């Protein structure tokens, strides 16, 4: 099950972080921020190939004992990080990929909103409902 979903700005500050067990919220914030180093390494390793590539899914960033951390980066260098419970072995890579695409589409809808200033924290009921449905879908 997905326990945390985060949207991180190009400058590496959080635009949106949602975690399911709220008592471990600080732990998930730490996990998301430590994963940004791995995201930056993967982006720099891809170099110019990332610009030409349409698939922006970074895959498994790193596993821990309890969780697996996955990453995705947009063309505008906004990063999506998803922390998944490692006990969920039924979750496949293509399902994670489609969840990131759905998250990216919802983020694009927010960016198209004329009342949203790019770089501000995301406060959207529609985005919250989409994230909640994704977290429940994975359960």
Curated annotation (Swiss-Prot):
Compartment(s) where it occurs, according to its Swiss-Prot or TrEMBL record: Cytoplasm, Perinuclear region; Endoplasmic reticulum; Golgi apparatus
Main location: cytoplasm
The keyword Endoplasmic reticulum is assigned to this record: yes
Entry's Gene Ontology BP terms: endoplasmic reticulum to Golgi vesicle-mediated transport
Assigned GO CC terms: endoplasmic reticulum; Golgi apparatus; perinuclear region of cytoplasm
A Pfam family this chain is assigned to: Sedlin_N
InterPro entries: Longin-like_dom_sf (IPR011012), Sedlin (IPR006722), TRAPPC2L (IPR044760)
Top-level taxon in the UniProt lineage: Eukaryota
Keyword terms, alphabetized: Cytoplasm, Endoplasmic reticulum, ER-Golgi transport, Golgi apparatus, Transport
PANTHER family: TRAFFICKING PROTEIN PARTICLE COMPLEX SUBUNIT 2
Similarity section: Belongs to the TRAPP small subunits family. Sedlin subfamily.
Task of the protein: May play a role in vesicular transport from endoplasmic reticulum to Golgi.
Name of the protein: Trafficking protein particle complex subunit 2-like protein
Species per Swiss-Prot/TrEMBL record: Taeniopygia guttata (Zebra finch)
Taxonomic classification: Eukaryota, Metazoa, Chordata, Craniata, Vertebrata
């Amino acid at each position: 099950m997905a326990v945390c979903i985060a949207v991180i700005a190009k400058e590496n500050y959080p635009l949106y972080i949602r975690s399911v067990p709220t008592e471990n919220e600080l732990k998930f914030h730490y996990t998301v921020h430590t994963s940004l180093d791995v995201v930056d390494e993967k982006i720099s390793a891809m170099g110019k190939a990332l610009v030409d590539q349409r698939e922006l899914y970074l895959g498994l960033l790193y596993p821990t004992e309890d969780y697996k951390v996955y990453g995705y980066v947009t063309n505008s260098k906004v990063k999506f990080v998803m922390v998944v419970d490692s006990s969920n072995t039924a979750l496949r890579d293509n399902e994670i990929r489609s969840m990131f695409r759905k998250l990216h589409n919802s983020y694009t809808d927010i960016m198209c909103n004329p009342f949203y200033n790019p770089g501000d924290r995301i406060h959207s009921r529609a985005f919250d409902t989409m994230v909640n449905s994704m977290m429940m879908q994975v359960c």
